[in-house]
């Protein structure tokens, strides 16, 4: 069986693991087991410190926010039995002796393998505050407050920001750009914010979320900021960008990546076209539009658009006007073979991802802060993209076709 080609991110992660193993002098399974025990101890200690922060109402050394006559009083050591062996955990104390930790109760001397797996899973996935609280209470009988869980899950934010700033590949065959909207509290008001999302397909045909940015309502100006961020992280060229037809979007793209070809999403255009069409006309009108975007080539598509005008312009003149006004970016896909056309003529790749995000976030009608929104989206993204392990089935053919159309820009 041929060895699987790893992505640059997988190779980078493997390199970090190799460095960690070398730094920790890991050369046996016993050493690996010790490393796992230390990881569990580190996680437990972080959770305990976060709980004590919540109990006292201020973080360590944050004396200006201290509003209690209680204080920290060093640490005690507790030995736990785990499936990896015994682990020593440093438990923080308060001077009054009122601190009752819930992550690791005072009389608790062991944690089962199931709890260990759940702790590591929750730490990696960052379940919502309420979900974690309910899960721990119902399954393990441990009660924790919303704010304690929030403090613990907030540990993921630096990880999310590091991910957002990670280096990217120099060339992407296709990048899909779209926004999804949420309500967030800001200065005492509930405001609608856009989360700008970029998904790239690299030259190996592998899909990856390049970034997610929380900003104001969708605008070409903010997209320009997003595109500059992508460039600063290492992207030098994008062959094709797939977008909606937001005003000024193409100018924002070309200001950063002047050679990039733009394909407006046909599905977005169809939605806009059908928005004010009478129900009794809808089926016939959409069939005539299909003759435009499903044509064998651009000339046939223009002929079909002429026929559409003759039939529908008296009743719905703005539809054909919109198609003609946006034709330069709607018709890009006609120059390519069918395999490339299917890849780029809609933004289904990113819309499918957005649907999965909405499933995760649908119970949350309003987010308290931008950070709480980013945290949940990052954790949902990590879970969704676990399944993105392979490349497109027809990628070898697509790559060969792109090597012809983008010969001067394709690396050797």
Enumerate the predicted regions with their spans.
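Electropositive nucleic-acid engagement tracts
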Residues: 59-67, 127-174
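Short, conserved DNA-binding cores of transcription-related domains
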Residues: 1-106
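Acidic/histidine-rich catalytic cores and adjacent linkers
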Residues: 3, 258, 291-412
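RNase H-like nuclease fold core
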Residues: 86, 90-95, 103-108, 142, ...
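Conserved beta-strand -> loop -> alpha-helix junction used to position metal-binding or nucleic-acid-contacting
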Residues: 240-247, 252-288
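Conserved phosphate/pyrophosphate-binding and hydrolysis machinery centered on Walker-type P-loop NTPases
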Residues: 7-10, 25, 29, 33-42, ...
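Basic, short loop/linker segments at the boundary and entry of helix-turn-helix/winged-helix-like folds
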Residues: 67-125, 141-150, 154, 170, ...
């Amino acid at each position: 069986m041929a060895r699987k080609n790893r992505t640059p991110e997988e190779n980078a992660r493997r390199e970090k693991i190799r460095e960690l193993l070398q730094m920790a002098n890991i050369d046996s399974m016993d050493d690996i087991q010790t490393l796992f025990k230390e990881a569990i101890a580190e996680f437990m200690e972080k959770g305990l410190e976060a709980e004590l922060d919540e109990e006292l109402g201020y973080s360590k050394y944050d004396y200006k926010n201290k509003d209690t006559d209680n204080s920290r009083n060093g640490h005690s050591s507790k030995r736990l039995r785990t499936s990896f062996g015994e682990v020593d955990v440093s438990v923080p104390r308060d001077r009054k002796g009122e601190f009752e930790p819930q992550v690791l109760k005072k009389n608790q001397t062991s944690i089962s393998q199931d709890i260990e797996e759940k702790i590591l899973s929750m730490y990696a996935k960052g379940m919502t505050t309420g979900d974690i609280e309910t899960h721990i209470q119902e399954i393990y009988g441990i009660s924790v407050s919303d704010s304690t869980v929030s403090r613990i899950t907030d540990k993921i934010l630096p990880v999310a920001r590091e991910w957002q700033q990670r280096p990217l590949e120099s060339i992407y065959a296709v990048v899909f750009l779209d926004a999804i909207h949420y309500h967030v509290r800001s200065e005492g008001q509930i405001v609608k914010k856009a989360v700008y999302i970029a998904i790239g397909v690299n030259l190996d045909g592998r899909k990856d979320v390049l970034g997610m940015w929380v900003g104001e309502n969708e605008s070409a100006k903010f997209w320009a900021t997003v595109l500059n961020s992508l460039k600063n992280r290492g992207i030098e060229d994008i062959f094709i960008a797939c977008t909606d037809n937001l005003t000024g979007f193409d100018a924002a793209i070309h200001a950063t990546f002047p050679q990039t070809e733009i394909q407006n999403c046909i599905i977005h255009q169809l939605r806009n076209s059908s928005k004010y069409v009478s129900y009794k006309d809808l089926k016939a009108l959409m069939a005539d539009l299909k003759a435009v975007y499903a044509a064998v080539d651009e000339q046939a598509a223009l002929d079909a658009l002429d026929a559409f005008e003759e039939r529908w312009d008296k009743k719905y003149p703005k539809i054909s006007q919109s198609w003609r006004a946006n034709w330069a970016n709607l018709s890009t896909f006609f120059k390519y073979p069918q395999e490339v056309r299917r890849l780029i003529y809609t933004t289904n790749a990113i819309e499918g991802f957005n649907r999965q995000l909405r499933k995760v976030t649908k119970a949350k009608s309003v987010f308290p802060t931008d950070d709480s929104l980013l945290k949940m989206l990052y954790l949902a993204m990590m879970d969704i993209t676990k399944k993105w392990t392979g490349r497109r089935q027809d990628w070898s053919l697509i790559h060969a076709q792109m090597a012809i159309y983008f010969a001067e820009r394709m690396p050797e």
